[in-house]
Amino acid sequence: MTELSILLHPDPRLKKISIQVTNIDERIKKLCLDMIDTMYNHSGVGLAAPQVGVLKRVVVMDCSDDGEKSPVTLINPEIVWSSEEVSKFEEGCLSIPHIREEIKRPSSVQVKFTDICGISKESYFKGLWATCIQHEIDHLNGCLLYTSPRPRDS
């Protein structure tokens, strides 16, 4: 697998909205695997395709805390429900290195997506996993940490 270059702020591609993936072909599968390697090589817990210069709605993440690698790939992720309860996490971003900021987001979310095998799924995320998927979906929508306000971030 190939380690991909991570775009850094203020690269204008980071502010563009990503397009839906319509066909999960070998190129998309390779992108997902390369993104997972890149995320691990940079000690990240999540990575969105726009961060590696690909304007497709693809996210990889692994927020497991048991030392085992448990990557999750989400293609065309969409939040279909979010809790009223909010949590604060200190977030960082591979595209804005060395800066962290406390952000408020819904504590839990339900996300509809397609996996790398083309299977439609819906998963419930809470805690750091919920924060991570919301952060990565922000990237898909052209929003960067620290540069764009979020609805619950007040």
Segments from the language model and where they lie:
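Positively charged
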Residues: 1-148
